């Protein structure tokens, strides 16, 4: 009995030590994002993509303004990787299934899969984001807009959802709102070249509309 108790105690100690070790790894990677050596910053951003959590989005968002191109790219990819982790093996499996359905252009099944994900884990922002994308592709702009609202409630750093608003409001010819969200997206991620181009187009459309009203 004593031996069993000793083994169980050792297992509990190992389990308790594992969590702080991962936390330390995250903290070290976050600190390394401010290192003078760009190579270390790049690796730190990649590492956070592997082990980071939503709590690391603030430092990764700051790294989107790093002077090094690769560090910025790695930080952006790290954020997407963190967003794609739900914390539930069942939901992660469904998420992968939904991604495959999106890739195959199966909008109806994709919407059904992400709706199931949302029902199982409503706090998982990326489930809402992917369904918003599918609704947009299906032409249901109002539902897409509503899902984007749910994304940013849960993840205010989600420049992808903010970019989605731009596309939706542009389709609705609400150019002022589209420009508002384009600027918000760039405030978080200044590397969104497509959004910058959208701003140029939207400003032109806005001017043309004003001229027609004169």
Per-region residue spans from a language model:
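Terminal, low-structured helical/coil segments at or just beyond the last alpha-helical repeat
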Residues: 97-100, 179-214
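Structural marker of alpha-solenoid helical repeat scaffolds
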Residues: 51, 66, 120, 154-155, ...
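Amphipathic alpha-helical scaffolding segments comprising HEAT/armadillo-like alpha-solenoid repeats
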Residues: 21-32, 53-64, 88-95
């Amino acid at each position: 009995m004593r031996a069993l108790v000793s083994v169980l105690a050792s297992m509990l100690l190992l389990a308790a030590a594992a969590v702080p070790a991962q936390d330390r790894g995250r903290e070290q990677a976050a600190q390394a994002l401010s290192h003078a050596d760009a190579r270390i910053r790049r690796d730190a951003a990649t590492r956070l993509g592997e082990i980071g959590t939503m709590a690391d989005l603030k430092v990764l968002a700051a790294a989107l303004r790093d002077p090094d191109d690769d560090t910025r790219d790695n930080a952006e990819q790290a954020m997407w990787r963190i967003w794609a982790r739900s914390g539930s093996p069942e939901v992660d499996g469904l998420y992968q299934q939904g991604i495959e359905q999106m890739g195959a252009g199966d909008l109806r099944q994709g919407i059904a899969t992400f709706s199931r994900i949302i029902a199982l884990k409503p706090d998982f922002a990326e489930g809402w984001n992917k369904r918003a994308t599918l609704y947009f592709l299906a032409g249901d702009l109002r539902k897409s807009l509503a899902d984007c609202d749910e994304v940013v409630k849960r993840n205010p750093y989600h420049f992808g959802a903010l970019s989605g608003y731009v596309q939706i409001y542009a389709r609705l010819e609400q150019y002022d709102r589209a420009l508002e969200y384009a600027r918000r997206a760039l405030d978080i991620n200044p590397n969104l070249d497509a959004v910058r181009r959208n701003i140029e187009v939207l400003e032109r459309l806005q001017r043309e509309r004003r001229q027609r009203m004169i």
